[in-house]
Structures are given as structure tokens and as C-alpha cells.
From Swiss-Prot:
Glycans are attached at residues 329, 366. InterPro entries: HRD3, Sel1-like, TPR-like_helical_dom_sf. Sel1-like repeats lie at residues 157-190, 275-309, 311-343, 348-380, 386-417, 419-453, 537-568, 571-602. This is ERAD-associated E3 ubiquitin-protein ligase component HRD3. The gene is HRD3. The chain crosses the membrane at residues 651-671. Component of the endoplasmic reticulum (ER) quality control system called ER-associated degradation (ERAD) and involved in ubiquitin-dependent degradation of misfolded endoplasmic reticulum proteins. Functions as an ERAD substrate-recruiting factor that recognizes misfolded proteins for the HRD1 E3 ubiquitin ligase complex. One of its GO terms (biological process) is ERAD pathway. Pfam families: Sel1. Keywords: Endoplasmic reticulum, Glycoprotein, Membrane, Repeat, Signal, Transmembrane, Transmembrane helix. It comes from Oryza sativa subsp. japonica (Rice). Its main location: endoplasmic reticulum. It is found in: Endoplasmic reticulum membrane. Belongs to the sel-1 family. It is a single-pass membrane protein.
Length: 694
């Protein structure tokens, strides 16, 4: 029986499958932080996608019915966005961003097209305002307006109402009603509801449905990544580090108000080339809370080029090719990319290769020269070169079609964090071209790209609200993004609920959240985040079950959550599992396993040396003096500690009592020192009678 319980963590249970799935997601999500730009000069955080031979098909050369046509003018090459969409995808009737930014146009234009449009706009604006003010009555009124708009068939209102229904805000929580409303909105073209539905299917392992939606959303994300006024958030900021506020990350996210930014700007104005280049990157990509501004980016890159900065030459070439902040001019793009390439800026070769594929800014198309330039870029580990060589071999453009070679190039680009390559590999997994059909992996990879869509800009507004002290609005926006499947938003919303539980910011079924509603909502969010690889979330879920916080005490479910965190190399979870084995709480009483977990904890985190040493001492005492008074005393400590802690907080830490205790301690110290002085003097004069003056 004991062995059976001990082996439980490795049994392929549904939770184990979820864990495996979301560990893959965590890996792929890191790639979403990479830039989608072709000749990208910014840093990319790589990750490793490891495939075995079994993942590849044996016959991967030649024609395939699912392969795209060999066309050099295909959309696969539109890295410089030849045609801009008629409308900014952010200004769809469903977007909240224009409602957050007073400078933006109304999502429905200057005048609402219908009464439902007017109700939706007024409702969402009132809801955001009520969340900021902590006004539950106004929030309920706003929700009623949104519901009225949803009844009128407005897809954005249906999507917002689905969010409120799923969270249990101003109405009983109902996942089935939320799903139905998201379905109505998605069928009407609402992309945010499609995100929510895709995530719902993904959690239920309904990969066929998830892949269909995520593929569409990933394509939309790639299309909009460079033409939207609000760039995708490629630096999701986690508000917390463990249980504490992540002050360093927050400090670096204050945009132009950040001290580091102001220092960089000052240095750039003083002629520092490195600072000019850095400032240009911040404006070009919209990093660290800085609003994207192509005009300022062009200004600083031009200044840097005047100082001889070769990296800025390459970026100027890209700016002219894209027409970002300037009139599109492929001749100028070719000039600057050529200058950069001569200065050994190898990613510029990738841009030149693109121009030769399309025949832009050059005499004519030249696929041979394009391939040579892509190869030079790839030889120097430029991910854009890998990607474009992959497209050449996948389609047989200027080379013999070879899917295996294409897959290898795409995988190298994926491991360098290239979003388009992630999209391509996802498509190969989806269609079973070159790689065995694997819808689970396709969903994972499509999801990581889809999360770069324009809807990700909500997290920018959530972060700005938090930094301004508008916790209510931050919670609402993070909760909205959590509904769309963003892990960072899920953990941020859960952390806010835990950290600011005493404040009136959580909207419940009727008025503000009760403590139980708040605990349950935070618990659900932590659980979703833990499914997506957040080890701290899994640890907190274990604590909730172990101590009965917001849920019924359940040692076995606590152990499952700790095992989930332990599988992600969390030292605290290892320590907790050791403690549970030592005391037989939810796990078999097994001192050998307890010691093993304690040892693992200190191996993973050397800072755990002291608590592990104390735990091992307790383990030795329990093993050698089982049933003794000392063991009973050790077992009673967890019950005594909260009482002592409460006494310290309520009595000792009270301002008045603390002053009295401090004065008393000072008095005792003075009396002690005085008595010691008297005794020392008496010892120095042994003939002096007792009581004589010193």
C-alpha cells in the first residue's frame, strides 16, 4: 500500500497529462518574447524545442498535398508588410483599448452605429471607472448596460458579459453561460472571445477545436504585430516575486518616468552613441513601458548613424522597408542594409535577401543571391536567416523542395525565438507535413504566437494602472486577460486578490466579494496559472489545501499540488513534501522519503540549508526517540507558533505596548549594568563593608 501511494506522482493521471501539456506551453511561451521583426537587433531569449526521430516523417522530400505552392510572392514573405490593413485591428467594435486611452478614437467611430454600440461603449467605460473608484453600485449599473447591449447582439458586449459571468461579477458564476456567450461573440467575429474559447478547449484537451481557433488568432497576431498603434506586449511583467512585490521589474516598467530611461535620454542628448541606439530601440519596439513612437525611433537611429553606429544602419534600412514613421522607400532600405552588411551586421544580409526575393529596391528578383544572403545570415546564427531558408526549402523556391531541410531550419529559428518560425512549425504539426501530426504541440505553439496579438496590450494598461495605484482597474484588466488564457495575468490577478484582500476592489456576485468569494477566485486563478507552469502558483494551491484557506482542508490534494510544484524544481515544495511524509499528512508516513525530499530541497536551493538542517535534526530525534516528550513537543510547535505570532502582533507590536516594553527593557538593562558595576567595584575593594558608598 505504501509503495502504491509513493508512486502516485508518476502515474499518468489527468493532472499529469495537464502538467506535461503546460510545461510544453511554458517552453513555447518564452519564444513569444522574441521580436517578430525580420532583421531584428534586439535581444531574444531562446528556448529549446527537442524533437526525437519519431517526430519526423520518413518521406519528407518532394511534393505533398498539404504543401503550399512554390510562389515567391506568397504571404509567407510579407515580412515588411507590403499592404497595410484598412483598419487598425485594435479599433474593432470589441476592443477595450480605445476606451482606456482618451487619445484614441472610439471603437465605434465618432458616433455609435447603433443603440447597442452606445450601450457597450458607455457600459465598459462606466465599468472601468467603477473599478477604479471601488463603487460596487456603479459597477452593477455598468454591467446592466453591457448586458442590454449583449441582448441587442453586440459581439463586444457578449464577450464582456461572458467574462463577467465566468468570474461571477454582479451575477452568479456560470462557466456554461460564459462559454455560450463567448461562442455567440466568436461566431460574430470577436477575436477576444475566440481567444477565450481556444483556451477553454485547450484546458479540456480538445486540441482539434483549440488548434482551429489558435491558428486563426496566431495569423492575426503576426499580421497586426507591426501595424498596430499599440505594439504587442513582448515583456509581460509579473507583479510579484513569490509572495512579495517585484519591485525591480516594476521600476523598469515606468516608461519615460523611469530613472534609467531618463539617464539614457540625457546621455543620448549629450552625444552618447550607445544611448542613442538604446533609446531608438525603446521607441521602436515599445519596450519597458515606453510607448511605441516610430518618429522618435527614426530620429535617434539617424543620430546614431551620424556617429557611425552600424547597428542603427540596419534598423534604418528596416524602417525604410516597412515605412515605419517615414515614407516607404526600398531604394533607401537597400542602401542602409548594404552599408550595415559591409560593417558585418549579419542580420542585414537577411533583409537584403528578402529584397532580392521580392525584387524590391534592386534591378530584378534574384533567388540565387537571396539564398546566398540568407545563408550568410544563418551561418552567423541570425534567426531570420534560418526562417527564410526554411521557407525556401519548404516551397522549393530557387532550390529543390526538401521538407526535412525546411523543418531543420525552422526548428533552429524556433529555438532562437522567431515567432513566424513558431507559427510555421505549428502549421507543420497541424497538417502532418514533415513532422508527424501532433495537435497538442500545434496548439501549444499557436497559442504562444496568438498571445502576441493586439489584445495583449491590455496588460500594458493593467500595469500602468497598478503603477498609478489604481489597483481596482488593474485587477479588472488582469482578470480579463486571465479569461483569455494569459498565465502572467492569471498569477497577477490572483496575487492582487491575496495582497489587497482588505481593500474594496474585488467585485462579487452581489456587491463586493466576500472573503470566501475572493479566496475561491484567487484559488481558481492560481490553479490555472499552475497548469501553465507557474511553480509558485502550484505551491500556493498546496498551501490553500493544507491550511484550509478558502477551501476545505485536504492533505491529499495539497500533496498533489506540492508534487506539481516539485516537478518544476521548487525547493519549498520539496521541503513541504518531506514534512508531510515525516508526519503522515496526506502521504504515507515514511522517514526515508522525508529525508530524500529534504535533501533535494537543499540541492535545489542552498539557501534552504538552515531549515533543512533543523528538519533533519527533527527527523533524527523522531527516528531514535519516537513517542518521547521531545517528539511530542516538536509536534506541538505548529499549534503553538500561531498563538505566539498572534500575541506578538496583537500585544507586542501594538504601538503603545511596544513603547512600554521598550522602556521596561531599557530600565532592566540600566539596573543590570548598575548592579554589575557595583559588584565589580566591591570585588576590587574587598575590605569595604557592604552598603558603604562606592
Amino acid at each position: 500500500m505504501q509503495n502504491r501511494r509513493r508512486s502516485r506522482p508518476v502515474v499518468p493521471t489527468p493532472m499529469a497529462r495537464v502538467r506535461h501539456r503546460h510545461l510544453l506551453l511554458l517552453v513555447a511561451a518564452v519564444a513569444a518574447a522574441a521580436s517578430a521583426l525580420l532583421p531584428c537587433a534586439s535581444a531574444v531569449r531562446p528556448f529549446v524545442l527537442v524533437l526525437s526521430r519519431d517526430d519526423f516523417l520518413k518521406d519528407t522530400a518532394g511534393a505533398h498535398p498539404s504543401l503550399p505552392s512554390a510562389d515567391a510572392d506568397s504571404d509567407e514573405w510579407d515580412d515588411f508588410d507590403d499592404e497595410s490593413p484598412a483598419t487598425d485591428p485594435l479599433l474593432s467594435p470589441s476592443s477595450w483599448v480605445p476606451l482606456l486611452d482618451p487619445a484614441s478614437a472610439s471603437p465605434s467611430g465618432d458616433e455609435p452605429d447603433s443603440p447597442s454600440d452606445a450601450l457597450f461603449v458607455a457600459g465598459v467605460r462606466a465599468m472601468l471607472s467603477a473599478a477604479s473608484a471601488g463603487d460596487d453600485a456603479a459597477f452593477a449599473t455598468a454591467a446592466a448596460q453591457i448586458e442590454a447591449a449583449a441582448t441587442g447582439g453586440h459581439p463586444g458586449a457578449q464577450s464582456a458579459l461572458a467574462f463577467l459571468s465566468g468570474a461571477g461579477m454582479t451575477r452568479p458564476a456560470s462557466r456554461s453561460r460564459a462559454f455560450l456567450l463567448h461562442k455567440f461573440a466568436a461566431d460574430a467575429g470577436d477575436l477576444q472571445s475566440k481567444m477565450a474559447l481556444a483556451y477553454s478547449f485547450f484546458r479540456q484537451e480538445m486540441y482539434e477545436e483549440a488548434v482551429t481557433l489558435y491558428a486563426e488568432l496566431a495569423e492575426a497576431a503576426l499580421t497586426s504585430s507591426l501595424i498596430s498603434k499599440e505594439p504587442p506586449v513582448i515583456e509581460p511583467v509579473r507583479l510579484h516575486s513569490g509572495t512579495e512585490e517585484n519591485k525591480e521589474a516594476l521600476r523598469k516598467s515606468r516608461g519615460e518616468d523611469d530613472e534609467d530611461f531618463q539617464i539614457t535620454e540625457y546621455q543620448a542628448q549629450r552625444g552618447n552613441t550607445v544611448a542613442m541606439h538604446k533609446l531608438g530601440l525603446l521607441y521602436y519596439y515599445g519596450l519597458r513601458g515606453v510607448r511605441r513612437d516610430y518618429g522618435k525611433a527614426y530620429h535617434w537611429f539617424s543620430k546614431a548613424v551620424e556617429k557611425g553606429d552600424t547597428r542603427a544602419m540596419e534598423l534604418l534600412g528596416e524602417i525604410y522597408a516597412r515605412g515605419a514613421g517615414v515614407e516607404r522607400n526600398y531604394t533607401e532600405a537597400y542602401k542602409w542594409l548594404t552599408l550595415a552588411a559591409k560593417q558585418q551586421q549579419y542580420s542585414a544580409y537577411n533583409g537584403l535577401g528578402y529584397l532580392y526575393v521580392k525584387g524590391y529596391g534592386v534591378e530584378k528578383k534574384n533567388l540565387t543571391k537571396a539564398k546566398e544572403f540568407f545563408e550568410i545570415a544563418a551561418e552567423h546564427k541570425e534567426h531570420g536567416g534560418y526562417y527564410n531558408l526554411g521557407v525556401l526549402y519548404l516551397k522549393g523556391i530557387g532550390v529543390k523542395r526538401d521538407v526535412m531541410t525546411a523543418c531543420n531550419f525552422f526548428l533552429r529559428a524556433v529555438n532562437a525565438g522567431q515567432p513566424k518560425a513558431i507559427y510555421q512549425v505549428a502549421k507543420l504539426f497541424q497538417k502532418g507535413v514533415g513532422l508527424k501530426r501532433n495537435l497538442q504541440m500545434a496548439a501549444v505553439m499557436y497559442k504562444s504566437v496568438a498571445e502576441r496579438g493586439p489584445w495583449s496590450s491590455l496588460s500594458r494598461w493593467a500595469l500602468e494602472s497598478y503603477l498609478k495605484g489604481d489597483i481596482g482597474k488593474a485587477l479588472l484588466l488582469y482578470s480579463r486577460m486571465a479569461d483569455l488564457g494569459y498565465e502572467v495575468a492569471q498569477s497577477n490577478a490572483a496575487w492582487i486578490l491575496d495582497r489587497y484582500g482588505d481593500e474594496s476592489i474585488c467585485m462579487g456576485e452581489s456587491g463586493f466579494c466576500t472573503d470566501m468569494e475572493r479566496h475561491l477566485r484567487a484559488h481558481a486563478l492560481w490553479w490555472q496559472a499552475s497548469e501553465q507552469g507557474n511553480e509558485h502558483a502550484a505551491l500556493l494551491i498546496g498551501d490553500a489545501y493544507y491550511y484550509g484557506r478558502g477551501v476545505g482542508r485536504d492533505y491529499e490534494r495539497a500533496a498533489e499540488a506540492y508534487m506539481h510544484a516539485q516537478s518544476q524544481s521548487n525547493a519549498q515544495a520539496m521541503f513541504n513534501l518531506g514534512y508531510m511524509h515525516e508526519h503522515g499528512h496526506g502521504l504515507p508516513l515514511d522517514l526515508h522519503l522525508a529525508k530524500r525530499y529534504y535533501d533535494q530541497a537543499v540541492e535545489v536551493d542552498p539557501a534552504a540549508k538552515l531549515p533543512v538542517m533543523l528538519a533533519l535534526t527533527s527527523l533524527w530525534i523522531r527516528k531514535n526517540y519516537d513517542g518521547s516528550f521531545l517528539v511530542h513537543f516538536i509536534d506541538s510547535l505548529p499549534e503553538v507558533y500561531p498563538v505566539v505570532e498572534e500575541w506578538v502582533e496583537d500585544v507586542l507590536m501594538d504601538e503603545g505596548n511596544a513603547t512600554i516594553f521598550t522602556l521596561f527593557a531599557c530600565l532592566v538593562t540600566v539596573l543590570y549594568l548598575r548592579e554589575r558595576q557595583r559588584r565589580q567595584a566591591a570585588a576590587a575593594n574587598p575590605q569595604q563593608p557592604d552598603g558603604a558608598p562606592i
